[in-house]
């Protein structure tokens, strides 16, 4: 009977480990799906920004470093 109880305890431990691993696997899968969704969204935003940058027209106003200082300097 002692061996039977030890085997039952061992099986119970293994079943618990499997249950925890299945839960962890589900959580990791959910995180992976969410990350892929975020990556897809960022790629769309990156393409949008790249297109905006291509269409960017430089301004006729000089940058502050290119401006001549005012007369009182």
Swiss-Prot record:
Belongs to the SlyX family. This is Protein SlyX homolog. It comes from Haemophilus influenzae (strain PittEE). The lineage of its organism: Bacteria, Pseudomonadati, Pseudomonadota, Gammaproteobacteria, Pasteurellales.
């Amino acid at each position: 009977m002692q061996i039977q109880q030890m085997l039952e305890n061992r099986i119970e431990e293994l079943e618990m480990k499997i249950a925890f691993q299945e839960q962890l696997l589900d959580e990791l899968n959910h995180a992976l799906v969410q990350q892929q969704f975020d990556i897809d969204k960022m790629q769309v935003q990156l393409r949008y920004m790249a297109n905006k940058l291509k269409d960017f027209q430089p301004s006729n106003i000089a940058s502050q470093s290119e401006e001549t200082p005012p007369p009182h300097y």
